[in-house]
Amino acid sequence: MASVKLPWDLEEEILSRLPPRSLVRFRTVCKHWNGLFSDKRFVKKHLVRARPQFIFLTESKKMYSIEIDLGGTIEVREVPYDFHCQPMKKNFTTIMACDGLLFRDFWKQGVAVWNPWLRQVGWIEYEDKGFRFCGVGYDSCKPDKCYKILGYFNCTRRLSDSLQEGYYQAAIYECASQAFKFIDTPNPFNLWPNKDPLSVNGNLYWLAHNHPETLEYFIETFDFSMEIFKPFCLLPCRKDFGSNELVLAVFKEDRFSLLKQCFETTKIEIWVTKMKIDREEEVVWIKFMTLPTTNLPNLDDTYCCSSYFIFDKTIIMCCGDYKTGATCIYMVRGDMFKKIQINSGIFQFSYCVYLPNLISVPFESHQV
């Protein structure tokens, strides 16, 4: 029986639905398939269909991906890596996602840029080792994506012959030019978050509150195009200072979702923004759902920051169980509730939500 050759359009459609770990194995099967990895249109099409997962950076210096099936099962994979160095102190190691790539900060050493599924690792090393990493973005107004790192230096200034004070000097490290650019702004990090910021469409966003003036919660942003800090929008719970636990997340790639848990009742509300965040319009929040209070943890009591994402009307939350010290995944959709404890000895100290993808590392890289 003669083999049947599928139309190329149909082949491509099938391949775009496969996870990156499967596609990577197929690179040697067919030159045409291998060419898809450098096809920007296909890479974007594949990314749109990606299901979010958690990437963990652990105390044992191992990294894991946590893939969640909506039926209520999870798959934990150790992710191989080969970085230039190891962290000096675990508390100064951060991992965050920016447009499909992972950026891992090594305090006083540099930043690794990584796609775990393509097994590519790049390295950014700045000459001044006193630069403290805060987040990654780029100028979205330019056609070419040139990454920039926002951070700061700990500085001192003399007030008199016998008195001096410390202050933060904000700066941007431009990866293309390998140069620092200082930002002239007073007290830039007064509103800096205790949770890692989100990188969306080139800019950084995080939760802040105006305390003690108005007690309003809002989203602060750093705009890499204008190179300024500025408020983005108020939150729907803007007057409830001190009575809620708030967690900000990305919704549908270009919108925000906000999880609000009341300290007293542990009731959880999920809000989402109506429009894309890059539109020049007033931000409108819509209540997306209310979650039951009996089974979900009190997020204020968890031993590390909680994180979550929404996929196919399912809330998937990750946090550490304060009593057992274990990492737990919670899944809520309609009447369905599942709590899954990860029993592989993972005690995380840094993690983020990540979309598996085929985006190549733009910096000098090597295969892991």
Swiss-Prot record:
NCBIfam families: F_box_assoc_1 (TIGR01640). It comes from the Eukaryota. It comes from Arabidopsis thaliana. InterPro entries: A_thaliana_F-box (IPR050233), F-box-assoc_dom_typ1 (IPR006527), F-box-assoc_interact_dom (IPR017451), F-box-like_dom_sf (IPR036047), F-box_dom (IPR001810). It holds the Pfam family FBA_1. This is F-box protein At3g17710. Residues 1-46 form the F-box domain.
